[in-house]
Swiss-Prot record:
Keywords for the protein's UniProt record, in alphabetical order: Chloroplast, Membrane, NAD, NADP, Plastid, Plastoquinone, Quinone, Thylakoid, Translocase, Transmembrane, Transmembrane helix, Transport
Record's subcellular location: Plastid, Chloroplast thylakoid membrane
UniProt entry tagged with the keyword NADP: yes
Pfam families, sorted: Oxidored_q3
Gene3D superfamilies: NADH-ubiquinone/plastoquinone oxidoreductase chain 6, subunit NuoJ
Subunit structure: NDH is composed of at least 16 different subunits, 5 of which are encoded in the nucleus.
Gene from which the chain derives: ndhG
Catalytic reaction annotation: a plastoquinone + NADH + (n+1) H(+)(in) = a plastoquinol + NAD(+) + n H(+)(out); a plastoquinone + NADPH + (n+1) H(+)(in) = a plastoquinol + NADP(+) + n H(+)(out)
Membrane topology listed for this record: Multi-pass membrane protein
Family: Belongs to the complex I subunit 6 family.
Top-level enzyme category: translocase
Organism expressing this protein natively: Lemna minor (Common duckweed)
Molecular function in Gene Ontology: NADH dehydrogenase (ubiquinone) activity; quinone binding
Name of protein: NAD(P)H-quinone oxidoreductase subunit 6, chloroplastic
């Protein structure tokens, strides 16, 4: 989207805040259905970031693949779970939770120190309009298809095998009831 500077900045900050709150919802909600809906919100915000970056095809692929398929599959698997499997116990903190929070806090402080120590003056933040070559959407889609079937064939197939194994594992876990 071609927006003016302040509007674009406000949208980026707003989407970033919604993205952070949605991510916290994914982690902190005890009900897995609420967590799955928060994950859907996070994935929609990522798609809106792609729209702000003028990458409409990636935004559409994000919506179709992740929100439309993966998140619906997660909700479908959660619906097959019994209610007792995610009961609300009073045992809120375990040793694993403490270790996880310690590791995440350490990573957060490491990122903050890295960002504050980085010299940002040499980075070009925007692209100039004369450097962007306009191409048809069809040719871009064809180029993506050609790259996926030639240059990135092995990673593409490995990702599809990983997704297939995850799907089979989720189905087998749901059937063990």
């Amino acid at each position: 989207m071609d927006l003016t500077g302040p509007i674009h900045d406000i949208l980026v900050v707003f989407l970033g805040l919604v993205l952070i709150l949605g991510g916290l919802g994914v982690v902190l909600f005890t009900n897995p259905i609420y967590s799955a809906f928060s994950l859907g919100l996070v994935l929609i915000c990522v798609s809106l970031f792609y729209i702000l970056l003028n990458s409409y095809f990636v935004a559409a692929a994000q919506l179709l693949i992740y929100v439309g398929a993966i998140n619906v599959l997660i909700l479908f698997a959660v619906m097959f779970m019994k209610g007792s499997e995610y009961s609300n116990d009073l045992n809120l903190w375990t040793v694993g939770d403490g270790v996880t929070s310690l590791v995440c806090t350490s990573i957060l402080f490491l990122l903050i120190s890295t960002i504050s120590d980085t010299s940002w003056y040499g980075i070009i933040w925007t692209t100039k309009a004369n450097h962007i070559i306009e191409q048809d959407l069809i040719s871009n889609v064809q180029q993506i298809g050609i790259h996926l079937s030639t240059d990135f064939f092995l990673p593409f197939e490995l990702i599809s095998i990983i997704l297939l194994v995850a799907l089979i594992g989720a189905i087998s876990m749901a059937r063990q009831n």
